[in-house]
């Protein structure tokens, strides 16, 4: 259940409203007038809660739940108690999330810390910076020379935007974010501690020591990207580092210089992607994946958590392990090792 101390619903919805907004089919119209004012898990549901069940293995928890309505698939309908409105859909979690964004808009687009959307007199702003209307810059933020910021963007307290950077419309730049040598699109969200556009790890060694290679590229972040807390993205050496439209990157991820990440990718926490690697559209990396430099990962690829990718991966494949290889091969090798261990144990 949402904690109303932090997240207050912006409105109330009836079950009929929810069905209309999502296109879900309401099986018991007598519940149309019932009010929904919060989201919950099945276990923590209270009066007014909306829940969802997407897999049959979780459906037993419906019994005894206090939720007023549930999104579910056709195969789960028979498990829903008579006390609950049934909203049938092929995408329960997606529809649940849609209603959540309507009920709690502040949870997906953070609001100013001080409650007022204005340019604070206590921000440090270079006189050449340019802002569109409805920009909010909070106290303690630093905005460098020739920066341009689009309409409706929020720059939080202690964020630092370096000279010549461009930030689009309706973006959220959280506290302690630093941005330099970067072009950022619309509706981008950078969470606390994110560092964008710093030097890449480029050096050349020799008998006289280690010399730095100038990093002369940029970071391009396309529309709709979200980047989690304390993630770092290095600018390119000569090319750009690019994060494609709609991609979502978790906390504590390192993306090196010249990396190209496609559209609508998902990258979980603690991944490390080495320089000049490219990742195709709609690919997914589990937590803790490491990718070597100059690797080409195709479109719609899935990589299991803690894998080490050292070879190119074709479109649509699922890989895992270290070094990573196709799932079937990985599982066979794991099974073989287990059977060898059993044989050795029996012989001893």
Swiss-Prot record:
Gene Ontology cellular component annotations, sorted alphabetically: membrane
List of catalytic residues: 257 (proton acceptor)
Record carries keyword Kinase: no
Single GO MF annotation: N-acyltransferase activity
Catalytic activity from the UniProt record: a UDP-3-O-[(3R)-3-hydroxyacyl]-alpha-D-glucosamine + a (3R)-hydroxyacyl-[ACP] = a UDP-2-N,3-O-bis[(3R)-3-hydroxyacyl]-alpha-D-glucosamine + holo-[ACP] + H(+)
Pfam families the UniProt entry points to: Hexapep (PF00132), LpxD (PF04613)
Xref: SUPFAM superfamilies: Trimeric LpxA-like enzymes (SSF51161)
InterPro entries with a match to the protein in the record: Hexapep (IPR001451), Hexapep_transf_CS (IPR018357), LpxD (IPR007691), Trimer_LpxA-like_sf (IPR011004), UDP_GlcNAc_AcTrfase_non-rep (IPR020573)
Repressor listed as a keyword: no
Known partners and oligomeric status: Homotrimer.
Record function comment: Catalyzes the N-acylation of UDP-3-O-acylglucosamine using 3-hydroxyacyl-ACP as the acyl donor. Is involved in the biosynthesis of lipid A, a phosphorylated glycolipid that anchors the lipopolysaccharide to the outer membrane of the cell.
Name recorded for this polypeptide: UDP-3-O-acylglucosamine N-acyltransferase
Gene: lpxD
């Amino acid at each position: 259940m949402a904690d109303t101390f932090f997240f207050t619903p912006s409105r109330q919805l009836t079950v009929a409203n929810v069905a209309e907004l999502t296109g879900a089919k309401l099986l018991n119209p007598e519940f149309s007038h019932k009010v929904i004012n919060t989201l919950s898990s099945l276990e923590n549901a209270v009066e007014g809660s909306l829940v969802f069940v997407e897999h049959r293995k979780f459906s037993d928890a419906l019994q005894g739940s206090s939720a007023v309505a549930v999104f579910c698939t056709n195969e789960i309908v028979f498990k829903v108690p008579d006390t609950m409105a049934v909203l049938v859909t092929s995408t329960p979690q997606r529809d649940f999330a849609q209603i959540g964004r309507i009920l709690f808009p502040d949870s997906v687009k953070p609001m100013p810390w001080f409650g007022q959307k204005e340019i604070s007199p206590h921000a440090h702003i270079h006189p050449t910076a340019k802002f569109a209307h409805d920009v909010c810059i909070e106290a303690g933020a630093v905005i460098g020379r020739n920066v341009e910021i689009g309409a409706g963007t929020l720059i939080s307290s202690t964020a630092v935007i370096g000279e010549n950077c461009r930030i689009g419309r309706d973006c959220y730049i959280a506290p302690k974010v630093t941005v330099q040598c970067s072009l950022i699109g619309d509706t981008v969200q950078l969470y606390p501690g994110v560092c964008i556009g710093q030097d890449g790890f480029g050096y050349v060694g020799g008998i006289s020591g280690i010399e730095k290679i100038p990093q002369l590229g940029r970071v391009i972040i396309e529309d709709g990207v979200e980047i989690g807390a304390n993630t770092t993205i290095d600018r390119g050496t000569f090319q750009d580092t690019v994060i494609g439209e709609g991609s979502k990157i978790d906390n504590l991820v390192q993306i090196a210089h010249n990396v190209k990440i496609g559209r609508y990718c998902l990258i979980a926490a603690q991944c490390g992607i080495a320089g000049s690697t490219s990742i195709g559209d709609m690919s997914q990396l589990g937590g803790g994946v490491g990718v070597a430099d100059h690797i080409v990962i195709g479109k719609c690829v899935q990589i299991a958590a803690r894998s080490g990718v050292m070879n190119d991966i074709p479109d649509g494949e699922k890989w895992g392990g270290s070094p990573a290889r196709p799932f079937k091969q990985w599982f066979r090798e794991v099974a073989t090792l287990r059977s060898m261990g059993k044989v050795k144990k029996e012989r001893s």
